[in-house]
């Protein structure tokens, strides 16, 4: 009996928009851009498979290549058999950055007011205050050192003729791999 793959709950993870710089030898591929009825695999198809296997993106159906779930952009595309050594994509992926913790706000009676208007007891609110203190004493998240090593993770899952060369943790606001590209 095959093992059933458990799905990750995307709500438990933060995400971030990053840029990835790729290099690939196109000899074995039907170009960069995914084609639903193509005879050969494409670079985007291999990227999709690696990103979903690593649980870096959370599509509704992993078997259907649909980039809508992750703010995907690409700087260009290549034809069948063409190689590239500086292709850039922009994509929203899972991050190691901790989700913001809920801070406890007390009313004048010392009880936390919940969204539905219910109240917790004072003891629970005091526990919340302790939790709030812990939140402020945590060390700040380092965008590179504390983050998922995206190139290493993806390169382990991608075929040998497709490599992630680098990643940018903080692309400029409004970055689009397509429209921010200066040359092709």
Predicted regions, residues:
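Structured-RNA-binding interfaces characteristic of tRNA pseudouridine synthases
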Residues: 1-184
């Amino acid at each position: 009996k095959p093992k059933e793959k458990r799905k990750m709950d995307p709500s438990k993870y933060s995400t971030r928009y990053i840029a990835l710089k790729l290099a690939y030898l196109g000899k074995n591929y039907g170009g960069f851009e995914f084609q639903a009825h193509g005879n050969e695999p494409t670079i985007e198809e291999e990227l999709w498979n690696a990103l979903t296997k690593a649980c870096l993106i959370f599509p509704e159906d992993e078997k259907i290549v649909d980039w809508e779930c992750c703010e995907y952009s690409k700087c260009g595309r290549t034809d069948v058999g063409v190689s590239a050594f500086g292709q850039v994509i922009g994509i929203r992926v899972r991050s190691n950055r901790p989700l913001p913790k809920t801070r406890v706000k007390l009313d004048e009676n010392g009880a936390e007011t919940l969204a539905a208007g219910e109240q917790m007891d004072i003891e629970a609110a005091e526990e919340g205050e302790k939790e709030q203190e812990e939140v402020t004493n945590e060390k700040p998240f380092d965008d590179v050192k504390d983050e998922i090593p995206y190139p290493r993770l993806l390169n382990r899952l991608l075929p040998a003729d497709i490599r992630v060369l680098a990643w940018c943790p903080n692309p400029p606001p409004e970055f689009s791999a397509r429209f921010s590209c200066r040359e092709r």
